[in-house]
Swiss-Prot record:
Has the structural arrangement of an alpha-helix connected to antiparallel beta-sheets by disulfide bonds (CS-alpha/beta). Expressed by the venom gland. PROSITE patterns: SCORP_SHORT_TOXIN. Pfam families: Toxin_2. Disulfide bonds join C29-C50, C35-C55, C39-C57, C45-C60. Gene3D superfamilies: Knottin, scorpion toxin-like (3.30.30.10). Keywords: Amidation, Disulfide bond, Ion channel impairing toxin, Neurotoxin, Potassium channel impairing toxin, Secreted, Signal, Toxin. This is Potassium channel toxin alpha-KTx 6.8. The keyword Cytoplasm does not apply. Blocker of voltage-gated potassium channels. Residues 1-23 form the signal peptide. It is found in: Secreted.
C-alpha cells in the first residue's frame, strides 16, 4: 500500500513538473526573434525562447 502511494505521488509530481512545450521539429536560432515565426507555424502561438541555439515553442493559454 505504501509503495503504491509513493509511486502514484511520483507519477503525479512528474506530470506536473514537465514543461509545457512542443518541439517535434528542431528549429535553429540565435535570438528569440528567430523563433517567433516558425513557432507560430508549428503551434499557432508566437511564444518561444531560444535556448542552446534551439527554439522552444510554448503553447498559448
Amino acid at each position: 500500500m505504501n509503495a503504491k502511494f509513493i509511486l502514484l505521488l511520483l507519477v503525479v509530481t512528474t506530470t506536473i513538473l514537465l514543461p509545457d512545450t512542443q518541439g517535434a521539429e528542431v528549429i535553429k536560432c540565435r535570438t528569440p526573434k528567430d523563433c517567433a515565426d516558425p513557432c507560430r507555424k508549428q503551434t499557432g502561438c508566437p511564444h518561444a525562447k531560444c535556448m542552446n541555439k534551439t527554439c522552444r515553442c510554448h503553447r498559448c493559454g
